[in-house]
Amino acid sequence: MMEKPEGLKLIDENGRRIDGRKKYELRPIKMEVGVLKNANGSAYIEWGKNKIIAAVYGPRELHPKHLQRPDRAILRVRYNMAPFSVEERKKPGPDRRSIEISKVIKGALEPALILEMFPRTAIDVFIEVLQADAGTRVAGITAASLALADAGIPMRDLVAACAAGKIEGEIVLDLNKEEDNYGEADVPVAIMPLKNDITLLQMDGYLTKDEFIEAVKLAIKGAKAVYQKQREALKEKYLKIAQEVEGSE
């Protein structure tokens, strides 16, 4: 969180935010599944100005063998921001933030995967941020979950994610870049809606106990809306495949 420039209003007296949204409104979200031919599974997501692609490879035999688990597959996640994803060119390669977010995303996805079905193997998830505009970790989790489903990895449920936060003393849904930079708090949440499980819960900033509870409830509500969009994106892909099969008969 940065110090807010003098005169900048993140929310006006009518409850409208800097990008015109209401307090509890998501940014526009577009999802597409199966965008990469050479990956076992893939997904592309546009979330506000974020543009993120996720690819899944595996399960495949893990080398070197001493890293193998005899009872389950190992999930490996790499989150990376392209050098051109932000206004000031980012130095290529992993940095501390990317390594930390990779671990966070792995922790959010792992409870959904039935890894016991693939002992001695690895499942690799690559998340590439092409354009960043706040909320890349929740968008990355959402895209990666879709890519895992597209790869046919057995899952207990999809993982959907969303963040809530606090700006100008108000709890709002889905912070954009200015709100993330100059707001007071950010609460990213990931859930498995069918199981009613939370797989990620973080907080950056300061909230009272009541504000925290309100933010978590709002983020869960947002994640459930994201979950419906995930389901629609998967249905769209498999309807297209069904139509192609029918057309070739």
UniProtKB/Swiss-Prot annotation:
Subcellular location(s) per record: Cytoplasm
Annotated consequence of substituting residue 89 to E: Does not affect ring assembly, but abolishes RNA degradation
Keyword Hydrolase among record annotations: yes
Annotated effect of mutating residue 91 to E: Does not affect ring assembly, but abolishes RNA degradation
Similarity annotation: Belongs to the RNase PH family. Rrp41 subfamily.
Phenotype upon changing residue 204 to A: Decrease in activity
Alphabetical UniProt keywords: Cytoplasm, Exonuclease, Exosome, Hydrolase, Nuclease
Quaternary structure annotation from Swiss-Prot or TrEMBL: Component of the archaeal exosome complex. Forms a hexameric ring-like arrangement composed of 3 Rrp41-Rrp42 heterodimers. The hexameric ring associates with a trimer of Rrp4 and/or Csl4 subunits.
Protein name per UniProt: Exosome complex component Rrp41
An example Gene Ontology molecular-function term: 3'-5'-RNA exonuclease activity
Entry EC no(s): 3.1.13.-
Record carries keyword Cytoplasm: yes
UniProt-listed Pfam families: RNase_PH, RNase_PH_C
SUPFAM superfamilies: Ribonuclease PH domain 2-like, Ribosomal protein S5 domain 2-like
Catalytic class of the enzyme: hydrolase
Entry GO terms, CC: cytoplasmic exosome (RNase complex)
Function, as annotated: Catalytic component of the exosome, which is a complex involved in RNA degradation. Has 3'->5' exoribonuclease activity. Can also synthesize heteromeric RNA-tails.
Gene assigned in the entry: rrp41
Principal cellular location given in the protein's record: cytoplasm
BP term (GO), one: gene expression
